[in-house]
Each structure stands twice: as C-alpha cells, then as structure tokens.
C-alpha cells in the first residue's frame, strides 16, 4: 500500500528573503537571522544552525553553506545567536567551567524561538530540526537530552557534552531521538575521546555519546562506509549508520581524520545533514492509500523544481496516473 498525496503545487520562480531580528526571551533581546525563499509553501520544514563559541549568527550562515541547501530543497533556516559573556564572547550556555554563574536558559530560548517562527511564518511544527558547530553542537546535545517535542532530529558537529553543565537529565532523556554526530579524530578543541582536564570542564567522548543514543533507540544493526578521498589530501570520512527494523530512528556517526571544523572537504556535510533530517519529515497533508500500476514521469522538490532522485531528499514523485507520492527517502519508491 502506498500513500498518495493530493496536492496542487506551483512555484514559478524563487525570491530570497534574509533578515535579522530580535526576540525577547527572559528579559533579554536575543538576535537571530531568518532565511528562506519567500515562496515556500505553507508547512515547510525549518532548520536551526547554531554557531560555535565566539561565533555569530552571520558567521555561521556564511560558514555552514546551509542557505544553498535550503534553496535546493525548500526549507527555512534560522541562525540564532548566543548571549555575550563577560569577556565579550558569544556562547551557548552548556556548562563551561568559566560560565559557572551564568543562568541563561538557551534550551528554552531555542525552543521558544522555534515555536514563534513556526507560528509567524506558517512553518511546520512537526518538521523542525537543529544542527550546530562546536559550542553550537553542544547545545544540540542538550536539546536532544531535553527530549523536546519542538525539534524532531539533531545533528551536532564537533561538539560534546559536559556532565557538570546545566542539564539535570544527562543519560536520562525524556525520549529516544534520532541524532547524527560528526567529529574529527584530530580535533584539538573538543577531543574525540573526551577530556577531564581542559579548561572547558570535563566532557564526554564521541563514542560514549553515540553508543548511548544507539542503546536508547534500541538499534541493533549498522552499516559502515568510507567516502572516497576525492582531493587526495589523506583526510578520510567514515560513516557508521545504526538502525533497526523496530524503529524509524537512526543514529549516524561521521568520523574523519581532520580537525575542529564543519566537516571533511570530500563531502558536503550540510547536504548530509539535510539528508538525515529528511528521513524524519512528517507529512500532515491528507493522504489516501491505494495500490496502482504507474510510471514515473518526474520528480520535484519542495519548491516545485524538477529534481534528480537524490538520496534521502524529501521529494514529490509524479506518476502517469496524475497523482503525487511523497517520500523523505527514494528507497520508499524502489
């Protein structure tokens, strides 16, 4: 039985929208950048991208490349900005030793901002995701442990978890969640194996965190693959994808022998992140189940642009019976 989406879809051209805004939270004016093609359909997905320590929303927008992925796949992007500490550095409150007296609740800020954007721009309340780099990856982990219903899946890059931080439910999350971890073996800012003595404060190793979420999601199988070294620089990325027939949740780990950065140059990590998020797109539009013989005519993305059959991208499949099938993953149509 296949699910058939009844949908009229029209998108003649793209106009891009990028603006900076303030959001009042707990008495603080918080900054963020909102980016989207202005002709996004109602109920489009929303992706948050959080900057690293000392970074900014503007810098993360330039660094991540996520706007281009949004243009190609039809989703909105929010680049939130942390608060500024007494040394003048922007940060997310994840429990660094030198922020021990800070009371800013960034978990609640991001959840509140996401809910506001969903309402204000008619974005999907079911399809909101978050990724982040370094300190931004750390706030992703905190949100994952929080088990919020606001964010559907999480993709921390080069981040970690500080057990002495601001969360009380470490290793006791409210619910299992899908998570995609990217980290370099030669990361000298957030060591892959964790560290007890860096000035950040004690933090956990990547394998400890990944194994926790694998167990939490009751995942029993995995696939391992190695990306080709396209530029012959010796930097290799290995993917390990954990899954199970008993749940839709997956846990991915992309490990590479590079340092503290957004990813290995052989892959487009922002596209990989969106591919992961696309697995968890929930379609709230009315569907009808039918079995039909059909031939594929064309494939469109969320913006109505004709699209190649890209792995794990949320697409609409038009068949000769004049109906559209939706899938977050082309494997549903194999």
Question: What role is predicted for each listed range?
Answer:
Residues 52-55:
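Active-site glycine-rich loops that stabilize anionic/oxyanionic intermediates
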Residues 58-107:
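Active-site machinery of serine-nucleophile hydrolases
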Residues 325-332:
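Conserved small/polar residues in nucleotide/adenosyl-binding loops
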Residues 38, 94-134:
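Gly/Ser-rich "nucleophile elbow"/oxyanion-hole loop immediately N-terminal to the catalytic nucleophile
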Residues 159-221, 231, 242-245:
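The feature captures the conserved acid-bearing segment of alpha/beta-hydrolase catalytic domains
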Residues 16-46, 58-64, 72, 102, ...:
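A domain-start/cap signature at the N-terminus of enzymes
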Residues 179-182, 216-283:
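C-terminal catalytic histidine-bearing segment of alpha/beta-hydrolase fold enzymes
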Residues 279-306:
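Residue-level detector of functionally pivotal "anchor" positions at catalytic/ligand-binding pockets or at interdomain
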């Amino acid at each position: 039985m296949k699910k058939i989406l009844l949908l009229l879809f029209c998108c003649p051209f793209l106009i891009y929208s990028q603006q900076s805004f303030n959001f009042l939270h707990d008495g603080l004016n918080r900054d963020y950048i909102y980016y989207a093609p202005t002709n996004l359909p109602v109920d489009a997905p929303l992706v948050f991208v959080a900057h690293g320590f000392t970074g900014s929303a503007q810098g993360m927008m330039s660094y991540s490349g996520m706007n281009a992925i949004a243009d190609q796949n039809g989703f909105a992007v929010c680049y939130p900005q942390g608060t500024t500490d007494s040394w003048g550095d922007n940060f997310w409150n994840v429990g660094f030793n030198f922020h021990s007296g800070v009371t800013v609740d960034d978990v609640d800020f991001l959840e509140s901002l996401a809910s506001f954007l969903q309402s204000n721009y008619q974005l999907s309340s079911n399809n909101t995701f978050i990724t982040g780099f370094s300190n931004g990856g750390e706030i992703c982990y905190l949100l994952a442990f929080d088990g919020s219903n606001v964010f559907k899946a999480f993709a921390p890059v080069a981040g970690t978890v500080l057990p002495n931080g601001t969360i009380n439910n470490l290793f006791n999350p409210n619910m299992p969640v899908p998570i995609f971890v990217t980290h370099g073996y030669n990361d000298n800012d957030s060591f892959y194996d964790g560290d007890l003595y860096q000035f950040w404060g004690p933090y956990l190793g990547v394998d400890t965190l990944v194994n926790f979420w694998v167990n939490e999601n009751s995942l029993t199988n995995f696939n391992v693959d190695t990306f080709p070294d396209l530029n012959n620089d010796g930097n290799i990325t290995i993917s390990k994808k954990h899954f199970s027939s008993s749940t839709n949740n997956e846990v991915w780990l992309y490990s590479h022998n590079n340092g503290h950065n957004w990813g290995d140059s052989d892959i487009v990590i922002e596209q990989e992140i969106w591919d992961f998020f696309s697995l968890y797109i929930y379609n709230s539009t009315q569907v009808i189940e039918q079995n039909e013989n059909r031939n594929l005519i064309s494939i469109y993305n969320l913006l109505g642009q004709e699209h190649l059959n890209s792995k794990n991208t949320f697409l609409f499949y038009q068949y000769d019976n004049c109906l559209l099938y939706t899938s977050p993953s082309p494997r549903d149509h194999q």
